């Protein structure tokens, strides 16, 4: 990894892209510290401090702490992520969008444009809900003393600032994709997660290391480090692990030449769905809890949905929520994989191109074979995701040490780093061959 970065900095063009990316990330972090005019950030922080941190940990990680501070980038890129998920689901339900997706680069540009508009719409809705819902309760400074007109103006300012902040982050992410290195949105999400890690490590230290004797403290630190390393290795396996299905193409005689006959493979990734099953399952379980707690309501049933209660030894009945979470994660793993990989479509394309999986009849038998292998691989990937997701949850329940970087964050960090390194290496190879051919 370090050799890749050293080699990249030796190349002038790639070095410029890396510096450009770093400068934009500085802008992102500065924007996350800029307060919104008229907002009492201290009040909002105190409001959130009364909420179980386990329920807002993923939101805190994705926004880099901007949500608690109610800064310019408080919504972060979560509206864009939600919009992308919505568009992926709509491509299945709406045939016109599915056709647009198959049009190649032009179709992808149209879908990207629609995604931007959906992002702005979602940002506006979320901003209005936050400003109006919490305005009179203290989010707006001195709201009780403000006139109706002045209060409405403050609401408009907050809504405009939050919506504009989300739009600016989306634009900055696209600039990184276009002129920098890596996927811009993923890079922004990565820096937000990393920015919250120092406080998380401080929490781990104060909970497991500081209260103990030096010998036990060192042992606890070694165990924590070992768990993190195991999680990273497991994520690397899930991200890069794949089952390759061999494919043989038939030979065709064109004049005096024999065309085709080459062998290739269909790579089926162990974790085809990526981090989406965890996000879907967590959001579905935590949304009712967050809404109830933000509005000052406390119900017994919310504890079954709250991850901070699932692994408490003194209250094992709440583990029912954990079982529901496990079932949801597995269901979403299969569901999202069915969106990204269609065995029937792949089998049909192979048949049209003259490709055959050795020992499998083209057509229906091929699709059934691919579906069988895919179901097996998805199950392995889902189990791996469960292990990664449950370790932080168990840490929260057994030891009451909630940290914002959970399994989702580790998957995103490792995935984005690997993807960015591969892109840098690819650009280095392209530069090398161009230089070689020009000599």
Task: Locate each region found by the language model.
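N-terminal cationic and glycine-rich segments that engage phosphates or anionic surfaces
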Residues: 1-101, 106-439
